[in-house]
């Protein structure tokens, strides 16, 4: 329980290679998985796929630009037509590099990009060929073109630069890929940094996986009462590669249950009305009624379904041939007033290109599309006849996650289109003006560079012009607060539904989420359940080409759809690949077995999913990108005599894995070179990837013991009955096909840190998952060479005493975020009520929970106009306008502050001036001497510290650029926030010195005292078990294993604690620190891991007397950073009204805010009085009134409102009680 490995873990007696594996061995498999995949493999694989294949595909898709220049026939000789053609070929990607302002290029490493605010990107080059054709244009004959010249561009074998693509760190094209640890140290990179993000203008950006519904699947839904449609079947067809161009087809069943004519109509794209389905079938060339019904209803004896189709056949009775049907559809098109032939062609085009485009967009596949439409109607009717439930929108197998690859592909496609359009325009201009066509000038490389950069920098995914329509928040700044918060951010997924939607369904945890997304880690509040996090072992498919699989199916007895005659083969199974119905098969069981064998051998990619629905007689194969899958152990088919089955994985495999791992660490043994990795397991068919769809066709055992039916039933009589032991469910089945590698792998990054999460009430784990991301620790080991905007580093981080096995892969022991505090659970003076706690001041003085805080300030000399720039210098009052009120004395002459200088609020740390253009007046403050204006950066007014580091460099334009880092030590004090790993957060209520704290008989004094009332209502039992286990761990000198779903019991831990001579449940006798008397009750006492959270009282404290005012309303400004006021809001106002405290109310809302004096005319009641206060003369010119004038005090905001109303021709007249009656 406490020790992970014996000392001789790698030394085996030569026992049976074929022995079954133990629970410990499954962790070896998990280690192999993470050693090969890492925690951000989904990001890296997706990006690699994009660079390796997608870009080339997208460029070849739009590869040829053609421009024809027809003969003008102005003179006899002018009868030559020309055709210009430009075609794109192979692409080349350079290494990430940068070009300095003086034109020198060099390789760029990520750290340089971060410090100099550059973009880590690689140049993209493409081969471009130009061809020119000519033809003699003889009227009445077709043109015959001949090539007259063909040239590749000579620049380096015809490679043209078309833009820079940002490179994901640690991907295949990153300079850090496959570097050793020492190389990384040399480049000032942290070896723990896992990559998976981009560097754009110096800031680290992650692409959050975007969840969407999968395309190309038929879904049937019921519609609720007021709608005339009772059921609807819909499919969102999307072409496999490229544009994600989506065309939706809906088949609607009109008429509610029990109504007479329940017709079925379909909504076609670009057609204004719904078209009866029989007409669509006839337009597809299927004329006889019987044949149409055959396409829909596969069983000719199913009279119920045929009965439902009767009204449809009757409805389409009028139209009996293909032409008429096509004309019927064409008439309802968007284009009006066109001839019949045109209409028919229009309808044909729509049926070919827009109707079910995912099947094909070529002509001659009408039969396939007809069968598919029939299948949709069949599904619709099955649901209407209550033989099948409606589809579940929230089924995770019907969702796809778009990662960096698909997201960038979508963007790249748009930008490349734009680029080709520009080239075409340039060609046209060149041809018209008979200029030389220069490719270098035609290709605007900034289109792609700037487009990708903009999307990644702002998170608005789409073109800059259409910023409103595009999705926001796709790219986010990587959270660098703690190492685990970074990891968690890289594995986050987002569902783009409106956050304000009150729909509960998409937010709920669904059964199909098991093992794929974490059940605990989701934010509270408006994004709850919409933002999810991947479980530790889940991966996302990158998408593979379905063609080999389709070829294989055709060879293995799949009959093509065109030859399918339903009534002849009623038992045939329909075969779908990526939602396209390709054909039927008569022996599906054998086919599925064969494909599975191929997949387990590695002949078919492991990420392909194979789903056989026996009841529906369907076989679905998915190879598309964005499916979430996870690995499982495969159970061997052979059944033993006693009915149990074995896992395919045996002790021998585990040994090979361990030897490989040992080689990696120790350098291995000379004699044998074993390289047995996770991939080897996959290719040996020992583990298998299963996605949410396929998971429903298999049976998964939770532990290895479940496979053996003889184990749970027989209770060993020698065991004394342990009341605390976990109760195992008795299985009534032994047809398992798979087994979980370990159930704790259902959790995500943040929840894997929680000890015993299976002993907590579920929302507590969710709270901790959110708080763990705010804990201080060491976010990366190279924090000293980074200039982050903000960074918090704990002085003495400790690894927890109660650990989970998953922490190994989260590197939590190497980069922890907390300390093991000695905690007593007691009231003791009552300064820990309501989630506050008492902390030991002496421990704080020794450095408990101290932290460093770094903040960086950045500035650069900007260009103004062509020649003039701002300059860093120490401004002088003599020649500089608008100087700030902080002190400039700490600056050196170059305008920068030296490291080691102590600074406090509002001190200037970067001095900079801007030249004033000679014609500017500067509000009359300017004298002859003033030639510049101050543009310096002061320290934040509420902070102080020591200047830690100053960096001077130049940016891409070659302008001077500085970053200054200020360092502060934050010592825990009253009001700072802490939390255990169970959602038990609290602030310090008081600190006592050691002599005032209670102590145990051994003289141990706690660091923290928390209130016992924090435990019962919150049911965080794991908090107590962790404390108990940590106590044992501290006494025995081992780490305590607090992983979820193990056989560890409180009794087991209590026994161990007893053996160390302590009270078995962790209680101790304590003495009052003030009086020395024994405390009445025994106190629960032991170490618990606590985290210091980022909310500190020094960053929150705020008060104000008088201060800055808003310009428009003259009310106090808002916000602590601007020294703003405290809002007396509507609710506070209501309380004052309820109390009847009128004078106080007037003081708060007027005197303390924006009191203002106006003069009003007693006659007209308007504020039109001209007041000369010096001479005591007043006059309302409109009324010629000089005597009847009153002075009133009203809020300035009210005066403003009155004036704005007057601007809208509404006259608010103010009357005093002394003005005359109107």
From Swiss-Prot:
Pfam families: RNA_pol_Rpb2_1, RNA_pol_Rpb2_2, RNA_pol_Rpb2_3, RNA_pol_Rpb2_4, RNA_pol_Rpb2_5, RNA_pol_Rpb2_6, RNA_pol_Rpb2_7. GO terms for cellular component: mitochondrion; pericentric heterochromatin; RNA polymerase II, core complex. It comes from Eremothecium gossypii (strain ATCC 10895 / CBS 109.51 / FGSC 9923 / NRRL Y-1056) (Yeast). This is DNA-directed RNA polymerase II subunit RPB2. One of its GO terms (biological process) is transcription elongation by RNA polymerase II. Zn(2+) binds at residues 1161, 1164, 1180, 1183. Belongs to the RNA polymerase beta chain family. Component of the RNA polymerase II (Pol II) complex consisting of 12 subunits. SUPFAM superfamilies: beta and beta-prime subunits of DNA dependent RNA-polymerase. Its EC number is 2.7.7.6. Mg(2+) binds at residue 835. InterPro entries: DNA-dir_RNA_pol_su2, DNA-dir_RNAP_su2_dom, DNA-dir_RNAP_su2_hyb_sf, RNA_pol_bsu_CS, RNA_pol_bsu_protrusion, RNA_pol_Rpb2_2, RNA_pol_Rpb2_2_sf, RNA_pol_Rpb2_3. It is found in: Nucleus. The lineage of its organism: Eukaryota, Fungi, Dikarya, Ascomycota, Saccharomycotina. DNA-dependent RNA polymerase catalyzes the transcription of DNA into RNA using the four ribonucleoside triphosphates as substrates. Second largest component of RNA polymerase II which synthesizes mRNA precursors and many functional non-coding RNAs. Proposed to contribute to the polymerase catalytic activity and forms the polymerase active center together with the largest subunit. Pol II is the central component of the basal RNA polymerase II transcription machinery. It is composed of mobile elements that move relative to each other. A zinc finger (C4-type) spans 1161-1183. It catalyses: RNA(n) + a ribonucleoside 5'-triphosphate = RNA(n+1) + diphosphate. Its main location: nucleus. One of its GO terms (molecular function) is RNA-directed RNA polymerase activity. Keywords: DNA-directed RNA polymerase, Magnesium, Metal-binding, Nucleotidyltransferase, Nucleus, Transcription, Transferase, Zinc, Zinc-finger. CDD domains: RNA_pol_B_RPB2. The binding of ribonucleoside triphosphate to the RNA polymerase II transcribing complex probably involves a two-step mechanism. The initial binding seems to occur at the entry (E) site and involves a magnesium ion coordinated by three conserved aspartate residues of the two largest RNA Pol II subunits.
């Amino acid at each position: 329980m406490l020790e992970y490995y014996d000392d001789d873990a790698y030394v085996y007696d030569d026992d049976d290679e074929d022995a079954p594996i133990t629970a410990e061995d499954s962790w070896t498999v998990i280690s192999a998985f993470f050693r090969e995949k890492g925690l951000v493999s989904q990001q890296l694989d997706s990006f690699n796929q994009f660079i390796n294949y997608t870009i080339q595909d997208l460029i070849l898709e739009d590869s040829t630009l053609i421009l024809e220049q027809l003969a003008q026939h102005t003179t006899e000789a002018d009868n030559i037509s020309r055709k210009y053609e430009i075609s794109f070929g192979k692409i080349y990607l350079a290494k990430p590099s940068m070009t300095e302002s003086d034109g020198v290029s060099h390789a760029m490493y990520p750290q340089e990009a971060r410090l100099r605010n550059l973009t880590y990107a690689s140049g993209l080059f493409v081969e471009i060929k130009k061809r020119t054709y000519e033809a003699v244009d003889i009227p009445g004959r077709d043109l015959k073109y001949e090539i007259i010249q063909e040239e590749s561009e000579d620049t380096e074998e015809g490679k043209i630069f078309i833009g820079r693509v940002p490179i994901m760190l640690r991907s295949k094209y990153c300079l850090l890929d496959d570097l050793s640890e020492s190389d990384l140290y040399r480049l000032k990179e942290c070896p723990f940094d896992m990559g998976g993000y981009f560097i754009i203008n110096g800031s680290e950006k992650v692409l959050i996986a975007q969840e969407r519904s999968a395309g190309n699947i038929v879904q049937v839904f019921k519609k609720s009462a007021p709608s005339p449609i009772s059921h609807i079947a819909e499919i969102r067809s999307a072409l496999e590669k490229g544009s994600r161009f989506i065309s939706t087809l809906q088949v609607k069943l009109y008429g509610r249950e029990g109504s007479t004519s329940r017709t079925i109509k379909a909504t076609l794209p670009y057609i204004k009305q719904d078209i009866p389905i029989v007409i669509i079938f006839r337009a597809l060339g299927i004329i006889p009624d019987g044949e149409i019904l055959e396409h829909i209803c596969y069983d000719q004896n199913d009279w119920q379904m045929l009965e439902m189709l009767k009204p449809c056949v009757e409805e389409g009775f009028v139209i009996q041939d293909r032409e008429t049907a096509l004309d019927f559809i064409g008439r309802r098109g968007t284009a009006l007033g066109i001839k019949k032939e045109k209409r028919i062609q229009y309808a044909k085009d729509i049926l070919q290109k827009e109707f079910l485009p995912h099947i094909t967009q070529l002509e001659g596949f009408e039969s396939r599309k007809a069968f598919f439409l029939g299948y949709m109607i069949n599904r619709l009717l099955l649901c209407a006849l209550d033989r099948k439930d409606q589809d579940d929108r929230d089924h995770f197998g019907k969702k796809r996650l778009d990662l960096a690859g698909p997201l960038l592909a979508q963007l790249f496609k748009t930008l490349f289109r734009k680029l080709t359009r520009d080239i075409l325009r340039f060609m046209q201009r060149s041809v018209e003006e008979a200029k030389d066509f220069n490719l270098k000038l035609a290709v605007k490389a900034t289109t792609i560079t700037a487009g990708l950069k903009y999307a990644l920098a702002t998170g608005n995914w789409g073109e800059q012009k259409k910023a409103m329509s595009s999705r926001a928040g796709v790219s986010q700044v990587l959270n660098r607060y703690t190492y685990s918060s970074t990891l968690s951010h890289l594995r986050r997924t987002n569902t783009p539904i409106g956050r304000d939607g009150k729909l509960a369904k998409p937010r709920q945890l669904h059964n199909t989420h098991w093992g794929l997304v974490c059940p605990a880690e989701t934010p509270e509040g408006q994004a709850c359940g919409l933002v999810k996090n991947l479980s530790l072992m889940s991966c996302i498919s990158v998408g593979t080409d379905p063609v080999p699989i389709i070829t294989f199916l055709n060879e293995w007895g799949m009959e093509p759809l065109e030859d399918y005659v339903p009534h002849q083969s009623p038992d045939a199974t329909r075969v779908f690949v990526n939602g396209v119905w390709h054909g039927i098969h008569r022996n599906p069981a054998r086919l599925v077995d064969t494909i599975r064998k191929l997949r387990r051998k590695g002949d078919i990619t492991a990420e392909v999913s194979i789903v056989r629905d026996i009841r529906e007689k369907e076989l679905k194969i998915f190879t598309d990108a964005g499916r979430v899958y996870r690995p499982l152990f495969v159970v061997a088919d052979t059944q033993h005599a006693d009915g149990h089955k074995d896992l395919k994985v045996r002790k021998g495999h585990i040994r090979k894995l361990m030897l490989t791992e040992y080689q990696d660490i120790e350098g291995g043994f000379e004699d044998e070179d074993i390289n047995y990795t996770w991939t080897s397991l996959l290719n040996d068919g020992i583990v298998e990837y299963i996605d949410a769809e396929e998971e429903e066709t298999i049976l998964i055992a939770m532990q290895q013991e479940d496979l053996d039916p003889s184990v749970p039933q027989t209770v060993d009589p020698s065991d004394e009955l342990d009341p605390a032991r976990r109760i195992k469910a008795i299985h009534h089945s032994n047809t398992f096909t798979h087994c979980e590698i370990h159930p704790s792998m259902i959790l995500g990054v943040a929840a894997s840190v929680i000890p015993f999460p299976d002993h907590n009430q579920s929302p507590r784990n969710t709270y901790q998952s959110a708080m763990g991301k705010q804990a201080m620790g060491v976010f990366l080991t190279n924090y000293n060479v980074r200039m982050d905007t903000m960074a918090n580093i704990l002085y003495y981080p400790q690894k927890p005493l109660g650990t989970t096995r998953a922490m190994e892969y989260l590197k939590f022991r190497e980069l922890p975020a907390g300390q093991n505090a000695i905690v007593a659970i007691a009231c003791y003076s009552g300064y820990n009520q309501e989630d506050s706690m008492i902390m030991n001041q002496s421990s704080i003085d020794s450095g408990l929970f101290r932290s460093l805080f770094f903040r960086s300030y950045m500035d650069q000399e900007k260009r103004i106009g062509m020649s003039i720039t701002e300059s860093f210098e120490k401004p002088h009052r003599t020649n500089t306008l608008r100087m700030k009120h902080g002190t400039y004395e700490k600056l050196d002459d170059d305008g920068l502050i030296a490291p080691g200088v102590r600074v406090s609020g509002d001190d200037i740390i970067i001095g900079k001036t801007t030249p004033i253009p000679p014609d500017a007046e500067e509000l009359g403050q300017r004298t002859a001497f003033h030639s510049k204006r101050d543009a310096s950066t002061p320290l934040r007014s509420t902070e102080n510290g020591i200047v830690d580091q100053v960096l001077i460099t130049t940016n891409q334009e070659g302008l001077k650029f500085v970053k200054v880092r200020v360092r502060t030590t934050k010592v825990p004090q009253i009001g700072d926030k802490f939390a255990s790993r169970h959602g038990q957060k609290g602030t310090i209520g008081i600190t006592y010195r050691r002599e005032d704290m209670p102590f145990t008989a051994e003289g141990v004094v706690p660091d923290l005292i928390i209130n016992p009332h924090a435990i019962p209502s919150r049911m965080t039992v794991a908090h107590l078990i962790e404390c108990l286990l940590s106590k044992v761990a501290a006494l025995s000198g081992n780490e305590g294993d607090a992983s979820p779903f193990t056989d560890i019991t409180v009794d087991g831990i209590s026994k161990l604690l007893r053996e160390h001579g302590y009270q078995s449940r962790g209680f101790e006798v304590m003495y009052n620190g003030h009086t020395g008397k024994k405390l009445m009750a025994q106190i629960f006492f032991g170490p618990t891991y606590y985290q210091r959270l980022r909310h500190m009282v020094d960053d929150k404290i705020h008060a104000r007397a008088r201060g800055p005012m808003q310009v428009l309303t003259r009310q106090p400004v808002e916000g602590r950073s601007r020294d703003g006021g405290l809002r007396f809001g509507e609710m506070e106002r209501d309380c004052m009204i309820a109390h009847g405290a009128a004078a106080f109310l007037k003081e708060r809302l007027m005197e303390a805010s924006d009191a203002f004096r106006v003069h009003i005319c007693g006659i007209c009641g308007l504020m039109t009085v001209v007041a000369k206060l010096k001479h005591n003369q007043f006059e309302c010119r409109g009324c010629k009134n000089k005597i009847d004038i009153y002075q009133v005090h009203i809020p300035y905001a009210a005066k403003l409102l009155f004036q704005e109303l007057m601007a809208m021709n509404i006259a608010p007249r103010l009357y005093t009680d002394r003005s005359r009656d109107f």
